[in-house]
């Protein structure tokens, strides 16, 4: 830190130069985050000084968090769900598994059973909590093999998980089947819908994946993905709100005396932004956003197949994967662990972006 500060213009110039080094969204085809909605950006500024970690100081912002949780609970077919705004899917998954562990204190060597598609946050969770992670291989279409999942459950298992909108392929595990496994074995069942939670409800005839399925204990979903909020904003929802009490710690010097959240200081700005977008768009607006992304996904697949790129799987949502092949320079495309090209067609990936990409693909084929 320098002894004397700089002029405002110098600071802005410096930061602008760094920002210019960041990649432009019109060439990013691999991210599950997107450009925030302009409403979210505006509202974020309104609430930039708020801290949900001390709710007595910010009762209005706390009410917004409550409304966000209620709105997302309604979307997940359970308006009475308990929940709070997290920093994203990693925190949500960790907290869900913490609860699962707290609910089974008698198990001394606990394990969790997760699909091969599980996000790496489950690895972090098991490392932090000292759990064994049992990974179930894929069945058909890069979804979990439910028969093998049932076989891997034993007396030390505390939870099973499903992924609704897998990170690599955008697929949905058979939540109803896994729920039966959970109920038969008295297990906590967590659905990681960090990506799919704000996509699947807006698809035509969506597969059951949320609290309408008996046996689902918790759901994670991220408004900072397809919800187009500012980053970071996730949400953890519980079927039984009182289970959050297993995580409570005393907070004697705050305006509340107990706290179940992982972070202490929690920004209210992203939460307000997320709620603002939900209020602005409504279900009708989100259906239109998702429909647009799906239409662009189909156009991408059509174009890639015309150049000889074979799709890896028929997508359920706005993720497209293909057998490996050349990618034009300047475009950010990722690869799955199996080596497939992976595209995520977020709201910033417009039809013009798709056509520009396909035009560049044509030049190298």
Swiss-Prot record:
State the UniProt keywords alphabetically.
Decarboxylase, Lyase, Pyridoxal phosphate
Output the Gene3D superfamilies linked to this UniProt entry: Aspartate Aminotransferase, domain 1 (3.90.1150.10), Type I PLP-dependent aspartate aminotransferase-like (Major domain) (3.40.640.10)
Q: Which GO terms describe its molecular function?
A: aspartate 1-decarboxylase activity; pyridoxal phosphate binding; tyrosine decarboxylase activity
Keyword Ribosomal protein found: no
| Entry EC number(s) | 4.1.1.11, 4.1.1.25
Whether Lyase counts among this entry's keywords is yes
EC main class here is: lyase
A Pfam family it matches:
Pyridoxal_deC
SUPFAM superfamilies in the record:
PLP-dependent transferases
Query: What residues bear N6-(pyridoxal phosphate)lysine in this entry?
Result: 225
Query: What does the record give as the reaction this protein catalyses?
Result: L-tyrosine + H(+) = tyramine + CO2; L-aspartate + H(+) = beta-alanine + CO2
What Gene Ontology terms for biological process does this UniProt record contain?
carboxylic acid metabolic process; coenzyme A biosynthetic process; methanofuran biosynthetic process
The pathway is:
Cofactor biosynthesis; methanofuran biosynthesis; Cofactor biosynthesis; coenzyme A biosynthesis
Cofactor(s) required, per the database record: pyridoxal 5'-phosphate
UniProt function note? Catalyzes the decarboxylation of L-tyrosine to produce tyramine for methanofuran biosynthesis. Can also catalyze the decarboxylation of L-aspartate to produce beta-alanine for coenzyme A (CoA) biosynthesis.
Q: Which PANTHER family match?
A: PTHR42735, SPHINGOSINE-1-PHOSPHATE LYASE 1 (PTHR42735:SF6)
What this protein is called in its record is: Probable L-tyrosine/L-aspartate decarboxylase
**Lineage, opening ranks:** Archaea, Methanobacteriati, Methanobacteriota, Stenosarchaea group, Methanomicrobia
């Amino acid at each position: 830190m320098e002894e004397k500060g700089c002029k405002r213009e110098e600071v802005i110039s410096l930061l602008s130069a760094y920002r210019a080094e960041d990649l432009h969204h019109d060439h990013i085809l691999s991210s599950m985050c997107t450009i925030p909605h302009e409403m979210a950006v505006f509202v974020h500024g309104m609430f930039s000084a708020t801290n949900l970690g001390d709710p007595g100081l910010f009762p209005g912002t706390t009410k917004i968090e409550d409304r966000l949780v209620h709105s997302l609970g309604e979307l997940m077919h359970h308006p009475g769900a308990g929940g709070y705004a997290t920093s994203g899917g990693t925190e949500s998954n960790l907290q869900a598994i913490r609860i699962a562990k707290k609910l089974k204190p008698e198990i001394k060597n606990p394990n969790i059973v997760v699909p091969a598609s599980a996000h790496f946050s489950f690895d972090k969770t098991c490392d932090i909590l000292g759990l064994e992670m049992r990974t179930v291989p894929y069945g058909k279409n890069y979804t979990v093999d439910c028969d093998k999942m049932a076989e891997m459950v034993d007396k030390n298992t505390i939870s099973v998980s499903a992924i609704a909108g897998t990170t690599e392929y955008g697929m949905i595990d058979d939540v109803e089947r896994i729920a039966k496994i959970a109920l038969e074995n008295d297990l906590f069942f967590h659905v990681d819908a960090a990506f799919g939670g704000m996509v699947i409800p807006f698809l035509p005839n969506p597969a059951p994946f949320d609290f309408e399925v008996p046996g689902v204990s918790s759901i994670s979903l991220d408004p900072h993905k397809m919800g187009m909020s500012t980053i970071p904003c996730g949400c953890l929802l519980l079927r039984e709100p009182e289970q959050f009490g297993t995580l409570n710690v005393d907070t004697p010097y705050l305006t509340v005396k107990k706290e179940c959240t992982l972070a202490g200081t929690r920004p209210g700005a992203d939460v307000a932004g997320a709620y603002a977008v939900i209020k602005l768009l409504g279900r009708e607006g989100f259906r239109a956003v998702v429909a647009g992304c799906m239409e662009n996904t189909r156009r991408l697949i059509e174009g890639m197949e015309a150049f000889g790129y074979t799709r890896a799987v028929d997508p359920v949502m706005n993720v497209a994967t293909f057998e490996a092949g050349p990618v034009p320079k300047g475009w950010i495309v990722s690869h799955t662990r199996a080596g497939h090209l992976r595209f995520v067609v977020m709201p910033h990936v417009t039809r013009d972006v798709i056509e520009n990409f396909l035009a560049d693909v044509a030049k190298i084929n």
